[in-house]
Amino acid sequence: DNAPLWDEFNPYLYDASVKLVSGKSTSLTTETFGLRDIRHEGNKLVMNEKPIFLRGTLECCIFPLTGTPPTDEASWEKLYASAREYGMNHLRFHSWCPPEAAFNVADEIGFYVQVELPVWSVTFGKDSATVEFLRAEAKRISKEYGNHPSFCFWGIGNELQYDFNILASMLGEMKAADDRHLYTTTSFTFEKGHGDWPENQDDFFVTQWTKKGWVRGQGVFNQELPSFDKDFRASIDGMEVPLVTHEVGQYSVYPDLTEIPKYTGTLMPLNFMAVKEDLEKKGLIDKAPEYLQASGKLAAILYKEEIEHALKTPGISGFQLLDLHDFPGQGTALVGLLNAFWESKGILTGEEFREFCAPVVPLLRFPKAVYTNNETFEA
């Protein structure tokens, strides 16, 4: 009853060894595991009887030097360290499952992981062979990685559309086979009649909006004057499971041309090279650092407001940024304050970012961004 439990603040691990002796033969196996109780109480995520808030970003299998994810723990230690430096406690593996090393490190440092099957499809269920492969893959993932305490959340895939009856059947099978995780049908969907409220079997709900309104700044910042006394509570009123905001941000930063020499492996930065060539032709190459800083500072302000909006909202259980680092997997998406190598672009330090993204964040509500000297500031 008094055994230490695993969480982000106390990632306590145990080793269990089993030895089988038969005549002159001996077999020994050791399993590392953690004890934790994760569930939801209404719209709150609860870990070991305490509410948790996910401060997350995506990992979209972005490894520019190799094109494949690393299988050594040192590489994952570096990646997780960068995420934690910027206040994160959660990674969503977007439409893929990482290798064993990623789970081992997450276990050791206390990171909450969301895994997905390798699918991002607008025709889910149309091809029966694909569905059967994914069913089998779910069983393999559960068998190989399911006992890791960091493996807290599981979704079938990203923005899935088409046959929600098959999705429901598949999620039911996954939940019945393995109750060590919390499950969601899909990380958001554009399917008509879905995506704005949880599916019946969802333990948590990942979305951009609900049937009552937006839960990320995309539908707010472009429509309203800056204000700091609002939140998304009207949009989640009546929500009965925890809500995590989907792919928050996507604020572009000008290319950091000093990044070009870093690409020494499988990926060539042709987009960066084209921008550099264009600036040189126009005699503007000296302006590139200024463009980076100006666009980056705006992106940082917007990310800050996104995060604080979520933190201010009772009933929101976390956010998943797109992205803390750049996303070169879908054209050019320089949406990160870190580059594709999880390295700083010099826009905002981790210490500065943690001022608004951390386990404890002071928040203030006030109605506008600009005041004159003859006004009284009330908050």
Sequence positions of predicted segments:
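Secreted/periplasmic carbohydrate-active enzymes, especially glycoside hydrolases
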Residues: 1-94, 105, 110, 137, ...
